[in-house]
């Protein structure tokens, strides 16, 4: 197990993975640092309120993939999203959003200016509702949702590396 081999653990993830690491940080205060990237804690899509019904009527919908500005870059992704899975994801957003105040670890929130998937208000919401006194938001001006594959990918790596290095000392 990684925790047994390291003095400090930091976690980072993109999109729904970012939501999952926020949830993880809420329940594991021993995590040294948290780096969500374009992490949703709510969605503004008008279909969200009817997901509990839709999931029984429609098995899946076209997936969102390759929200990337840099030409020629394609994100490997599924072509469909199960509606039951989307419903569970929205429930996770609610639980995670409710408990953001439990996060006291150092926090580096990253978001992209041209994200067409996650509402831009999520990053400031995370910043405002977490208890961490050591938090920073980095905005990437040239990328869309999949910033880790887009123009600003090196900036993501550099920002995360500097954050983790700072926490290591």
Q: What feature does the model see in each segment?
A:
Residues 13-17, 21:
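Gly/Ala-rich beta-loop-alpha elbow adjacent to hydrolase catalytic centers
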Residues 19, 35-45:
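Active-site nucleophile loop of the alpha/beta-hydrolase fold
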Residues 82-99, 105:
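Active-site nucleophile elbow and catalytic-triad environment of alpha/beta-hydrolase enzymes
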Residues 103, 109-111, 115:
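Short beta-strand/loop motif that positions the catalytic acidic residue
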Residues 116-122:
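Conserved alpha/beta-hydrolase "acid-adjacent" motif
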Residues 124, 128-146:
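Catalytic histidine neighborhood in serine/cysteine hydrolases
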Residues 141-169:
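Catalytic active-site module of serine/aspartate enzymes centered on a nucleophile-bearing elbow/loop
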